[in-house]
Amino acid sequence: MFHFTLQKNLGWLLLISVLMATPVNAHTEKVSNDVGGMLHIEPHDNAEAGKTAHVWIVLTRKGGQLIPLAQCNCQLAVYPQPHHETDTPLLKPSLHNVSTKQYKSIPGADIIFPKVGAYELELSGTPKSGASFKPFVLSYPVTVGS
């Protein structure tokens, strides 16, 4: 039988509150139809309110083949959380090519989140002429700190 004391209860409460308050955004992976996407946020995988966050998403087809921005009619939308499917996005940042040490010409954007809180980034895309992947929608939860 478990015996709970005030000290144990406060310890659990502290642990749970720390876990809930800690942003967990680093390299979030999602899949939609035959497209996978891995979100990356700079600086240091944490967005800060009022500061520019450099966001990019590595898109791959099933099997691992990279989908560059040049092959995708991609759109990025930022929603505050919670939101409804019919809500207008808070932001619709324009996408540009991002190249890193490992990836070339992937979709990226610079985003300034207006305040601390929970947001959802939604990347949708359809193939441009000559590309062969199914239309997709990838949604990523993002916690913005101060």
What are these regions (language model features)?
Residues M1, L19, T88:
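Extended interaction regions within the primary functional domain
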Residues F2-W12:
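Bacterial N-terminal signal peptides that target proteins for export
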Residues G11-A21:
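Bacterial N-terminal signal peptides
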Residues P23-S146:
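N-terminal soluble domains immediately following signal/targeting peptides that reside
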